[in-house]
């Protein structure tokens, strides 16, 4: 009879574990969960595809949701034309309107914010997101693709645009290296506490 009881208890504990409940040995009571899983979103704008590649690395590693920002008026493909437009937008404080509804960000605790480096900071669509979305109390962590400027002023601009949000350490990756950057992205996510150590 004792053998049957122990076996039955083990089966019940295994089934309960599969159902998502952890049990304290010998008690049959659920163990308290120490930390609720944080809901994570990657919000990004990608002009050439480099930032999108990093966003997809993050999604593959974490299973998080993606929000690809789309300006109402797409940017020109020509590099020099985009650089000129980005400079004007930054100087004038212009925030390009987005096609995306932004109210869904309220469901998330941690938002990783990705952008190409334009004039040493976030691209216009990302500045629009940071300036208009309800981000108070969220944890915001930037990642930037670049060709030599690194993070630039993006971390400082993030704190300026979202003073009531918490911010984490950013990641800068050269655009020419994004395809092979998965391990670097994984290390960054672990350091930020977004993946198990």
Walk through the language-model features, giving the residues of each:
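C-terminal segment of classical bacterial N-terminal signal peptides
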Residues: 22-27
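Boundary at the C-terminal end of the N-terminal hydrophobic targeting segment
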Residues: 28-32
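N-terminal secretory signal peptides and thylakoid transit peptides that target proteins
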Residues: 1-19
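FMN-binding flavodoxin-like domain, especially the glycine-rich phosphate-binding loop
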Residues: 2-7, 35-41, 45-77, 84-197
